[in-house]
């Protein structure tokens, strides 16, 4: 009973003031074991929450990008306050099966948690290394030496939760154990999951995604952690939905309005085509022809057209249209059955509108994606999530404004996230350089407190490797010295002395501590080539004594 009361008090804290749970504190305690455990990721989760709330209060944003490895994490820590771990990057570069591929979430489900652990271990290691180094300094030296907070909270890609409820629960457990401060889960079907900027995305019903979010929150509660939960929706550009079971989705599902197709479903037509030996382009032509005849519309669009065709006066027509728009406004989430009843009262009888006829061969319904559809999902997800993210097809401030105003009209304190995607051709967006520079702070004022370039690490890695490899092939070591070594020095990049960066001094401290303060085999002892980097250089170039120049690296002669 004491533990149940403790959990309830925790839920009553400011942290969870806006969070809705369909289960009780007793349910949570009953799922815990007798051995109470604590997790380092929980400290990072609390840090992340405070950081995001501060950004929300200040109208600013945490900006970050997907990190590939410990090198990127340590360099990002000097300038950015969060770290992102991208499923796309993991899929293409670091799956646990070592089989690369596109972002279809078909890699082993421990892939992203393992990358989180890889980076979290690196963060902790470089934090320990820095502390040991600073403890060897005098007070004056410490004051002169910038401190780097390597322990930046990690937010990781949870894709669709990787299956049913139990799969989501186990995935979330892995993330907590591996060091994630936050995760995001999207509302696509786990069977057909695609990168948010690919075609063919299939949504799940609103209620199914809520179940995923509840499963994640329950697992966090069982573990006693405050992991930040981000709910992503792909409803802005999706054109298919798995099910019509949730009435909140009905207003966005498309149906056939051409009565000539009654009883002639697309799926049956495609099956007949395949039976006749058609394939590829022929089947596509069949589908395209059928869809061109179908006159697909939402129920509301079909009713509006039917009212406009009625042989009545203009004033009466306007009255009926206004009444219909009142009843069918998107915030009411009118069901198909309710819509038909209201339409009949407005004189729309025997309306032909069939959402089953255009279903795909896989059984998916046609969906009309939009910002409004995303807003409706944002409303539904907000009580169960800490941050809401709408995936978009382009960097559009107007869409960002519509989504922000829509979601926050019902949930005014909701925090928002935004993908500053490299899948966008930013130069083709119509923005000037100044507008691109101001994009992050501009939408931050709309509540987008966490903004990230999902695949930023991969692109930066590819660019430097490609340009350096080409130059190195032509100019040899001069290319390395000019492009890398001198630039590391000019920009204060600590990998210039890579032995020190990797922690050779740190482990020398272990050796000397074990051996009473002296170790003849210390890695950074006499003879280490990194001594060459201890001098300060006035400029790069060959030694010219009469001009007072100093060599880039001390000669070994």
From Swiss-Prot:
Cellular compartment(s): Glyoxysome
Amino-acid positions noted as binding substrate in the UniProt annotation, renumbered to this chain: 86-88, 196-197, 232, 419-423, 454
MF-aspect GO terms: isocitrate lyase activity; metal ion binding
Domain of life of the native organism: Eukaryota
Predominant location: other
Short motif (Microbody targeting signal): ranges: 555-557
Location of the active site: 195 (proton acceptor)
Signal sequence range: none
EC number(s) per entry: 4.1.3.1
PROSITE patterns xref list: ISOCITRATE_LYASE
Residues binding Mg(2+), per UniProt: 157
Keyword field contains Lyase: yes
Cellular component GO terms, alphabetical: glyoxysome
Gene Ontology annotations of biological process type: glyoxylate cycle; tricarboxylic acid cycle
Cofactor: Mg(2+)
Pathway listed: Carbohydrate metabolism; glyoxylate cycle; (S)-malate from isocitrate: step 1/2
Keyword entries, A-Z: Glyoxylate bypass, Glyoxysome, Lyase, Magnesium, Metal-binding, Peroxisome, Tricarboxylic acid cycle
Family of the protein in this entry: Belongs to the isocitrate lyase/PEP mutase superfamily. Isocitrate lyase family.
Function: Involved in storage lipid mobilization during the growth of higher plant seedling.
Assembly mode: Homotetramer.
UniProt-recorded name of the protein: Isocitrate lyase 2
Gene it is expressed from: ICL2
């Amino acid at each position: 009973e004491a533990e149940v009361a403790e959990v309830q008090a925790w839920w009553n804290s400011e942290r969870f003031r806006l969070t809705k749970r369909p289960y009780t504190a007793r349910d949570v305690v009953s799922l815990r074991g007798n051995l109470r455990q604590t997790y380092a990721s929980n400290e990072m989760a609390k840090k992340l929450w405070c950081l995001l709330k501060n950004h929300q209060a200040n109208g600013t944003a945490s900006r970050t990008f997907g990190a590939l490895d410990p090198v990127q994490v340590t360099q990002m820590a000097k300038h950015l306050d969060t770290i992102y771990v991208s499923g796309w990057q993991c899929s293409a570069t670091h799956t646990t099966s070592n089989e690369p591929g596109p972002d279809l979430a078909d890699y082993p489900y421990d892939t992203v948690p393992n990358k989180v652990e890889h980076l979290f271990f690196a963060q902790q290691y470089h934090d320990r290394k820095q502390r040991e180094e600073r403890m060897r300094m005098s007070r004056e030296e410490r004051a002169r030496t910038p401190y780097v907070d390597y322990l930046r909270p990690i937010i990781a890609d949870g894709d669709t939760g990787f299956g049913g409820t139990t799969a989501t629960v186990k995935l979330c457990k892995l993330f907590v154990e591996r060091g994630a401060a936050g995760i995001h889960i999207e509302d696509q079907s786990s069977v057909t999951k695609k990168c948010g900027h690919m075609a063919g995305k299939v949504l799940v019903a609103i209620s199914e995604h809520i179940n995923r979010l509840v499963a994640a929150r329950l697992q966090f509660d069982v573990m006693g952690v405050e992991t930040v939960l981000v709910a992503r929706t792909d409803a802005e550009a999706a054109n298919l939905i798995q099910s019509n079971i949730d009435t909140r989705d009905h207003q966005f599902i498309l149906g056939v309005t051409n009565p000539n197709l009654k009883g002639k479903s697309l799926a049956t037509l495609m099956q007949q085509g395949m039976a006749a030996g058609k394939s590829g382009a022929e089947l596509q032509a069949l589908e395209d022809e059928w869809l061109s005849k179908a006159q697909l519309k939402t129920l509301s669009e079909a009713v509006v057209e039917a009212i406009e065709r009625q042989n009545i006066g203009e004033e009466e027509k306007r009255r009926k249209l206004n009444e219909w728009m009142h009843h069918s406004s998107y915030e009411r989430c009118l069901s198909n059955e309710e819509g038909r009843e209201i339409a009949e009262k407005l004189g729309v009888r025997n309306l032909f509108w069939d959402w089953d006829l255009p279903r795909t061969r896989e059984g998916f319904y046609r969906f009309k994606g939009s910002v409004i559809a995303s807003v409706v999902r944002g409303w539904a997800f907000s009580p169960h999530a800490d941050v809401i993210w709408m995936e978009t097809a382009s960097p559009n401030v107007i869409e960002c404004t519509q989504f922000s105003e829509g979601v926050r009209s019902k949930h005014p304190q909701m925090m928002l996230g935004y993908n500053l995607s490299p899948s966008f051709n930013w130069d083709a967006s119509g923005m000037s350089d100044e507008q691109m520079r101001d994009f992050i702070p501009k939408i931050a004022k709309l509540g987008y407190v966490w903004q990230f370039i999902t695949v930023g690490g991969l692109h930066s890695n590819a660019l430097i490797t490609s340009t350096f490899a080409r130059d190195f092939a032509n100019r040899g070591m001069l290319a390395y010295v000019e492009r890398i070594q001198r630039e590391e020095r000019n920009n204060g990049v600590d990998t210039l002395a890579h032995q020190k960066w990797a922690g050779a001094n740190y482990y020398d401290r272990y050796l000397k501590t074990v051996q009473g303060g002296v170790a003849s085999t210390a890695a950074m002892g006499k003879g280490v080539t990194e001594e060459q980097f201890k001098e300060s250089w006035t400029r790069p170039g060959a030694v010219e004594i009469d001009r007072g120049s100093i060599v880039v690296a001390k000669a070994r002669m």
